[in-house]
Amino acid sequence: MKASQFFISTLKEAPADAEVVSHKLMTRAGMIKKLGAGIYSLMPMGLRVVRKVEQIVREEMNRAGAVELVMPVVQPAELWQETGRFESNGPELLRIKDRHGRDFVVQPTSEEVVTDIARQEIKSYKQLPKNLYQIQTKFRDERRPRFGLMRGREFIMKDAYSFDRDQASAKASYQVMAAAYRRIFDRFGLTYRAVAADSGAIGGDLSEEFQVIAATGEDAIVYCPGSDYAANMEKAEALAPSGPRAAPKQAFAKTATPGKSTCADVAELLQVPLQHTVKSLVLATDTLNKEGAIVKTQIWLLLLRGDHDMNEVKVGKLPGLAAFRFATVPEIEAHFGCQPGYLGPMGLRQPVQLVVDREVALMSDWICGANEPDFHITGVNWGRDLPEPALVADLRNVVAGDASPDGQGVLAIERGIEIGHVFYLGTKYSQAMNATFLDVNGKPQFMEMGCYGIGITRLPAAAIEQNHDERGIIWPDALAPFTVVLCPISPERFPDVKAASDKLYAELLAAGVDVILDDRGERPGAMFADWELIGVPHRVTIGDRGLKAGEVEYQHRRDSAATTVGVTAIFSLLQAKLKA
């Protein structure tokens, strides 16, 4: 490709709404162009990167035995109603009507459609296993689309779906796909972690996220440096506390804490460690009638240590708390006789369901709210001042330094960007949609399923967050829009420069190298700045002075300076670099 034929559109400044590095650099490098909130055109330079991603993903999916198809972007609501997701999914699911008033959805995933295909086409155990995948446009109506391709509303995703005859073979299919994901991300040259994850709205009971390590990542990744343990924050656990509770040493006392409504403020006032305080979080669950009206509300009080944060996913998995919400101020006042900030488990006006974090269950002489403004209770002890807690659970997010649940050290936390996710679904969708096959005994069985996603358009953005400097993007070879750029200096003035550039360009093309020749006639400084911003890994500069000495200049995008190379050696050098 010659630059004069290509579409190159770089900017000196990023748009004001670009927050993260990848959004700024992809916009400045002319890879994406914003059309609307969370909706971007993939410009030619950006599309080349996306096609590289698709190619490697497609190769590894095919290698893993998956078969490609394409399913519709717009899908009938009836299929989604079979699984209940048409009603249960929030506003992120874009619902539309056609001219006849029929309901449709714009696909965020395609479990329903692929299960419908399977139930129509797969009749016997002899047809299993099967693995189908697509690389297709998706849409999620994000409330706050941001960060460019990192969290857009329209995006491209690879989604695969496996069908097996039993649980054992389904989990084997899961492992085949997880291994394929590792090969994919290894080929991209990214630093990543595979971490245990919660299955969330997709369903199932076995799940891993693939996270690119980046300081700007939205997700917290928890891992143990001394073992293989790794999980996202939603799933991560610390080693369960053990040992006898310390004997009480303090008297139960109502203590004035004027204007101190947070655990941190109370700890500072009383000059005690924050971990001696206990915070009270009030939740509510509603029972609805057939019309959707609330007929009963249960109030819950959760007790956590003052320096810990509630893990909403863990709490939502507790019996009775699947659909919890935070209680309103009137609900809190009706049960506690006090506004938030001074709440505690004693002296309630109405009973609540108490749930105690397992750390709090082992505490002695702790501090909590007195259910009276400007007062807290100090010296609180289980068994003496309160009955022993009946419901104890892990309610919190882990923190760095917690003991690893495998007993192999302490936990550390780093930031990451999710680029892939694998799920073992079991029979959640096949049961809901009656997708059965006849087993070896001629009896109908529900198909065991898995689903596997990769964010095709998110992956380049994640790669940039991990690979950039003050000059621009630094693409790994496998992702670069072009792997080599040739920069002739004033070829219109020096025929030997043009001839040498054309010769090397032709040799590289013949060798199958993804090369671009910059024949735009730009000044050297502007030309170099463009390619450093765009992030092409290998640059060769060809100038008249160097040619007279039989030399050209080679510079890798990560190098701070160029290296002189003999004209006759540059082709071999590039071949060696590209094979490394």
Swiss-Prot record:
It is found in: Cytoplasm. Its main location: cytoplasm. GO terms for biological process: prolyl-tRNA aminoacylation. Keywords: Aminoacyl-tRNA synthetase, ATP-binding, Cytoplasm, Ligase, Nucleotide-binding, Protein biosynthesis. Its EC number is 6.1.1.15. One of its GO terms (cellular component) is cytosol. It comes from the Bacteria. It catalyses: tRNA(Pro) + L-proline + ATP = L-prolyl-tRNA(Pro) + AMP + diphosphate. The keyword Nucleotide-binding applies. GO terms for molecular function: aminoacyl-tRNA deacylase activity; ATP binding; proline-tRNA ligase activity. NCBIfam families: PRK09194.1 (NF006625), proS_fam_II (TIGR00409). Catalyzes the attachment of proline to tRNA(Pro) in a two-step reaction: proline is first activated by ATP to form Pro-AMP and then transferred to the acceptor end of tRNA(Pro). As ProRS can inadvertently accommodate and process non-cognate amino acids such as alanine and cysteine, to avoid such errors it has two additional distinct editing activities against alanine. One activity is designated as 'pretransfer' editing and involves the tRNA(Pro)-independent hydrolysis of activated Ala-AMP. Belongs to the class-II aminoacyl-tRNA synthetase family. ProS type 1 subfamily. Homodimer. Consists of three domains: the N-terminal catalytic domain, the editing domain and the C-terminal anticodon-binding domain. This is Proline--tRNA ligase. The lineage of its organism: Bacteria, Pseudomonadati, Pseudomonadota, Betaproteobacteria, Burkholderiales.
